[in-house]
Amino acid sequence: MIEKNVVILRIETGNPSGVVRYIQMLTEGMKHMNGIKVHIICLNTSLIFPKFEVTEDRIIANIPYPSKSKPLRNEIYWLTKYFNVVSDLISPYFKNRKQLIWHVQELLLVKLADILKLSLGGHILTHLHIIPWKLSLEYNESLFKKQYSQWLNNTFNLINENQLEKIAYPLSDRIICVSYSAMKHIISAYGIHPDKISVIYNGMDDTGITLQERKSRTPEILFVGRISREKGVICLLNALNKVASRGYFCKLKLVGQCTGYMSSHIRKAYKQLKIDILGTVSFNELKELYTTNTIGVIPSLHEQCSYVAIEMSMFGMPMIVSDVDALSEMFEDEVNALRIPLVFDEDFGLELD
């Protein structure tokens, strides 16, 4: 039997993310699969020189990636030039490998996968971890409001202007989505045939997880994720303000990456609330938080198949989640979570109800 060689293409920025978690789960799981070898091509934003680790079973290539370079960020021509250089560096290590599967974790890298495919053969498998147009909520809210308004009316002339998506989906031999909402996006906005798409939810190994009794008298609410508006943190804080004004008090723990500006804003604007901003913590510390806090909250304004949601569920946390995207698929209201609807106004934007 000819061995398959799965080559994961990813970008490393040093920040924790669902993509990083997925790759950890995938590589660990693949160790137990016969006939499959897993390799990694990583474009690393912190490197100056390329670094290769080569064994008989595995190739790990770390390539410098100047992500802040304006030509690479703004022009497909220069990005393609860069990818050609990366291909020239990498190709000698894979020239004798057969049954290559270029497993792309970022839409940006599909063009690199296509260059490698033309040189070395194989197939391109694109893994869609996000719905790209919804990211505009974070960097261009005015655009997001227009896109969301059109999406509600099943029109896509603003949504389908994403150049990366226009390039990536036709070049992909197969596309994996982590939710049916993402699959619907690809079909509706870009006309990709459903037969080309598979939906595979994220998953985790639950070995070694022990459920514990929660003993805290004061309700302790746990949020895990990037501490930002799009993750619903401001909506959560506003809701807790209303609860406090009615004489009910709880403690909120915010775990995850947080900018200095956001941290300062939270401490000033919500100083009447009991809030601990813990920053990024290890998974062992997360386990402790999952088992000792009263309620897990995922108030995201958009969300795919969240590993935090999976982890909280595995540890038996009572949960409140926003009724959006993959969270709507993962949780049944008043069965395994309380689902909070979203409301949209063209002037005020998207909020939790």
PLM features: residue spans?
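Nucleotide-activated donor-binding/catalytic signature segment of Leloir-type glycosyltransferases, i.e.
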Residues: 263-284
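A conserved mid-protein helix/loop that constitutes part of the nucleotide-sugar donor-binding site
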Residues: 21-28, 219, 223-242
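Carbohydrate-associated surface elements
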Residues: 181, 203
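Aromatic "clamp/platform" in nucleotide-sugar-dependent glycosyltransferases that forms part
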Residues: 301
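Glycosyltransferase donor-sugar binding loop
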Residues: 224, 251-264, 279
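Membrane-proximal helix-turn-helix segments that form the acceptor-binding/catalytic region
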Residues: 132, 148-175
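Short His-centered aromatic/hydrophobic patch
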Residues: 104-109, 128
